[in-house]
Amino acid sequence: MLATDLMIPAVADVRGTTITYYDSRDEKDRDDVLVMIHGTSGSTKAHFGFLFPILAAKQRVVSIDWTQPAPNGKPIELDQLVDQVAGAIEEILPGRKAFLLGYSLGAVVTAAVAARRPDLVERLVLVAGWMKTDLQQILRNDVWQALRASGDGAIRAYSTFCAFGGPFLASKTLADLQPGMDAMAFDAFGDQQMELNRRINIVEDVHRISAPTLVIGCTHDQMVPIRHQKALFGAIEDARFAEIPTGHAVVFERPSELTHHIQRFLDEPEAFTAGSIVPTPQP
């Protein structure tokens, strides 16, 4: 089956808000359903174009796209995105728990869902997430905001520089990266998410997470440095930690390695006990 056959959008009504989601539907004779939440300015197609069809080959996969919860120019709140995800799970998977995965800002949202709605979450994967925004992140955000306000095309180069790891960029040419830079889309909802990123603080939530959790950090991440994922690992009682040698854009740099860690946690949740460091897969 082609990826395009799986990634067909559907809609759910969540307390009067229309939420777009993608559902592979075939449960592959498994009880667990993987629910994925994208990151800042992303979508299912933008962030999970590789992961969705590969993971859907072994179990049912649902991926939820946020709906803009406030008018252009108005701030959005984390609680609004958390409510969208929790409500969508209740609507799409009534009476069931999800294997919940979040990437980047999606990891912040899913961590909060797991803390506040443990009845909805069986297990949790947090990819390149964080608990509390620090000064390094705010300074990077300041530069992004200035470039966005100026309309300078340099925002595409800056976003690429920040998203990918140094070793990955050093192995490419500008011509290799130009199509992706040209395809970047900027809109009001993305601007709202970038502003929200400045105000993240889920420290109290994270300490309440009870679901078995896999935290995945990225060695060369400049957007959410790996110390943040290590802090999540330390704060969640039933957590194990895996590290992938990429920048923040792990879903593009090493999607196969990322998929390996996710699938193993699905297939063998007891393979690594709480507090374990998951080894790098060997060829």
What are these regions (language model features)?
Residues 219-224, 249:
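Acidic catalytic loop of the alpha/beta-hydrolase fold
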Residues 111, 115, 123-151:
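Flexible "cap/lid" loop of the alpha/beta hydrolase fold
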Residues 49, 211, 225-234:
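Short alpha-helix in the alpha/beta-hydrolase fold that links the catalytic acid
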Residues 246-260:
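Catalytic histidine-centered segment of alpha/beta-hydrolase-like enzymes
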Residues 49, 62-99:
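Active-site loop/oxyanion-hole signature of alpha/beta-hydrolase fold enzymes
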Residues 209, 215-217, 221:
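Short beta-strand/loop motif that positions the catalytic acidic residue
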Residues 135-137, 153-205:
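Conserved alpha/beta-hydrolase catalytic His-Asp/Glu region
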Residues 13-71:
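Conserved HGGG/HGGXW glycine-rich cap/lid loop of the alpha/beta-hydrolase fold
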